[in-house]
């Protein structure tokens, strides 16, 4: 009888310890789950800051190279450029880096995709029209929407092999490049229009002198 009581107490002790360990494990797992959510929120916030930095730099650069900037006095342009350079310098002081975890295959896919985009960018000066068409086909390969033009199937398969975060960055880079080309086209057209209007005015003035 005494031995049975001793065994019962021993079993009770083991049950208490086991129950206590399970509770601790559950609490620790719950804490880690909550921390995982905060880690992902931190990465998302840092990525948002990265994107905001890119957008700000692009906007400052766009203002500096705008047609409006060319149509003001030298003194005003110099003053505005000083302000723009100051803002650009302050923006560049913000350093945010979100590293993407990649396996070897994803790393190789990213290098391949980056190399293809760089090759197109290097052709800008030689043939802007062709480069723009090529970029649009690359962008269509990254878009989940129904493409409005041709899709570079080879590039699409390469991008699919990249990490999800890298896929988003590739798409953003292509969007930025296409916007820059669009802005350049507009600036050239405005410049040609202003030159054409100026030539027409000069011609009219010359004709009026002879009449």
Swiss-Prot record:
Keywords (A to Z) from UniProt: Acetylation, Chaperone, Coiled coil, Phosphoprotein
Domain BAG: from-to ranges: 109-189
Top-rank taxon, per record: Eukaryota
GO cellular component: axon; cytosol; dendrite; dendritic microtubule; protein folding chaperone complex
Keyword presence, Phosphoprotein: yes
InterPro entries: BAG2, BAG_domain
GO biological process per UniProt: negative regulation of protein ubiquitination; positive regulation of proteasomal protein catabolic process; positive regulation of protein processing; protein folding; protein metabolic process; protein stabilization
Modification N-acetylalanine, positions: 2
Keyword Acetylation recorded: yes
Modified residues (Phosphoserine): 20, 31, 73
Coiled-coil region(s): 20-61
GO molecular function terms noted in the UniProt entry: adenyl-nucleotide exchange factor activity; heat shock protein binding; identical protein binding; protein-folding chaperone binding; tau protein binding; transmembrane transporter binding; ubiquitin protein ligase binding
Job of this protein: Co-chaperone for HSP70 and HSC70 chaperone proteins. Acts as a nucleotide-exchange factor (NEF) promoting the release of ADP from the HSP70 and HSC70 proteins thereby triggering client/substrate protein release.
Subunit relationships: Binds to the ATPase domain of HSP/HSC70 chaperones. May interact with NWD1. Interacts with HSPA1A (via NBD), HSPA1B (via NBD) and HSPA8. May interact with DNJC9; the interaction seems to be histone-dependent.
Protein name stated in the entry: BAG family molecular chaperone regulator 2
Species annotation: Homo sapiens
């Amino acid at each position: 009888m005494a031995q049975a009581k001793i065994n019962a107490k021993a079993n009770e002790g083991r049950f208490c310890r086991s129950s206590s360990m399970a509770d601790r494990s559950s609490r620790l797992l719950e804490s880690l789950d909550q921390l995982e959510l905060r880690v992902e929120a931190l990465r998302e916030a840092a990525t948002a800051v990265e994107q905001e930095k890119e957008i700000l730099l692009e906007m400052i650069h766009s203002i500096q190279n705008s047609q409006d900037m060319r149509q003001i006095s030298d003194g005003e342009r110099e003053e505005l450029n000083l302000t723009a350079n100051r803002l650009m310098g302050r923006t560049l002081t913000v350093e945010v880096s979100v590293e993407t975890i990649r396996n070897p295959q994803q790393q190789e896919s990213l290098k391949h995709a980056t190399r293809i985009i760089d090759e197109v960018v290097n052709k800008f000066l030689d043939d802007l029209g062709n480069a723009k068409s090529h970029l649009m086909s690359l962008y269509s390969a990254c878009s989940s929407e129904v493409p409005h033009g041709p899709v570079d199937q080879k590039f699409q398969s390469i991008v699919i092999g990249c990490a999800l975060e890298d896929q988003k960055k590739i798409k953003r880079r292509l969007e930025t490049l296409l916007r820059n080309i669009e802005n350049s086209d507009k600036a050239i057209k405005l410049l040609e229009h202003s030159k054409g209007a100026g030539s027409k005015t000069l011609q009219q003035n010359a004709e009026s002198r002879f009449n």
